[in-house]
Swiss-Prot record:
Domain notes: The C-terminal domain interacts with the N-terminal domain of RDX.
Disulfide bonds: C71-C184, C150-C176
The encoding gene: LAYN
Organism expressing this protein natively: Homo sapiens
Chain positions covered by the region annotation Interaction with TLN1: 337-382
Glycan-carrying positions: N117
Topological region Extracellular: 22-235
Signal peptide annotation: 1-21
Region ranges (2 X 4 AA repeats of N-X-I-Y): 356-380
Protein name: Layilin
Molecular-function annotations in GO: carbohydrate binding; hyaluronic acid binding
All copies of domain C-type lectin, residue ranges: 45-185
Region of interest (3 X 5 AA repeats of E-S-G-X-V), residue spans: 340-375
Subunit structure: Interacts with NF2, RDX and TLN1.
Length: 382
């Protein structure tokens, strides 16, 4: 894996952990506090009183044991409905909340006893607050028994009616680990009923949204959660800034190094032109090149034929006093004495060929040619 990919994976994992920590704190059942809600009592003060706990967010709803523990810590118990009038009263409480779909736990639960032939399944259900009331509001085909031990009050406004009529506010046995809303009841007598905690069951709760809470409290809570999320995100991003800068600098350095390496590997487009010894004959009719061309032709002819006797090839130097009309400046092949003025020796007796460079005439050059046996071929001023 490349270092850049690994760094991105680590940053993503840290960011996800920080966001999860910012969304909510994991609570146990003992952390749930219902004292912020106002109980509803008959006539305002008469006992028993009730609290209808409804969660707008379905992920915050509680299972049966969690709901029972929350009511107990608030000084109550899961509701026991002892008469039809009390059933109607609780239905009105729920209707005033205008909640959406979501069943409510009530304090009815089946005892963990083996069912005998003489004992019906529904006779095994009892109230968790110790009430001995035999009032029941089961739906037509309930209870179904089996693995469904705890009891809920149906609240599914969007559900169509079943074979036994509407489901609304009817009772149904359900699995105790299901997440639902619940109703607490506060009576004059508060019998100490030991709570049965579900063994080996992990509880993850968040602070519930009670129906009695005002919009201002909700806004404050939302603002607090948003601020905590922003702080957690800042704590994650600020330490990661040096790593991001290091990654950017490393990327830029690698890019510059690769560009320079590619530039060095590319061939140089400029090529040097190779000049031939002899200039091109099509360069023009410059008077300065006529002497050069004549010597070249004479050299080629001289090399092509066999010469039994070598002789010096000279040309007459045009005098500066002669005019163009009476000076032909023709080239003559003749053997002369090197000491004579007006001639420049081009070829020595020992070389046997004509070279392609012309010295300017001077007595010093004449003496050098006589001693070395040949004349160096360079053209001055060309």
């Amino acid at each position: 894996m490349r270092p850049g990919t690994a760094l991105q994976a680590v940053l993503l994992a840290v960011l996800l952990v920080g966001l999860r920590a910012a969304t909510g704190r994991l609570l146990s059942a003992s952390d749930l506090d219902l004292r912020g809600g106002q109980p509803v009592c008959r006539g305002g003060t008469q006992r028993p009183c009730y609290k209808v706990i409804y969660f707008h967010d379905t992920s915050r709803r509680l299972n049966f044991e969690e709901a029972k523990e929350a009511c107990r810590r608030d000084g109550g118990q899961l509701v026991s409905i002892e008469s039809e009038d009390e059933q109607k009263l609780i239905e009105k409480f729920i209707e005033n909340l205008l909640p959406s779909d979501g069943d409510f736990w009530i304090g009815l639960r089946r005892r963990e006893e083996k069912q005998s032939n003489s004992t019906a399944c529904q006779d095994l259900y009892a109230w968790t607050d110790g009430s001995i009331s035999q009032f029941r509001n089961w739906y037509v085909d309930e209870p179904s028994c089996g693995s469904e031990v705890c009891v809920v009050m149906y609240h599914q406004p969007s559900a169509p009616a079943g074979i036994g009529g509407p489901y609304m506010f009817q009772w149904n046995d359900d699995r105790c680990n299901m997440k639902n809303n619940f109703i607490c009841k506060y009576s004059d007598e508060k019998p100490a009923v030991p709570s049965r905690e579900a063994e080996g069951e992990e509880t993850e709760l968040t602070t519930p949204v009670l129906p009695e809470e005002t919009q201002e409290e909700d806004a404050k809570k939302t603002f607090k959660e948003s601020r905590e999320a922003a702080l957690n995100l800042a704590y994650i991003l600020i330490p990661s800034i040096p790593l991001l800068l290091l990654l950017v600098v490393t990327t830029v350095v690698c890019w510059v190094w690769i560009c320079r390496k590619r530039k060095r590997e590319q061939p140089d487009p400029s090529t040097k032109k190779q000049h031939t010894i002899w200039p091109s004959p099509h360069q023009g009719n410059s008077p300065d090149l006529e002497v050069y061309n004549v010597i070249r032709k004479q050299s080629e002819a001289d090399l092509a034929e066999t010469r039994p006797d070598l002789k010096n090839i000279s040309f007459r130097v045009c005098s500066g006093e002669a005019t163009p009309d009476d000076m032909s400046c023709d080239y003559d092949n003749m053997a002369v004495n090197p000491s004579e003025s007006g001639f420049v020796t081009l070829v020595s007796v020992e070389s046997g060929f004509v070279t392609n460079d012309i010295y300017e005439f001077s007595p010093d050059q004449m003496g050098r040619s006589k001693e070395s046996g040949w004349v160096e071929n360079e053209i001055y001023g060309y």
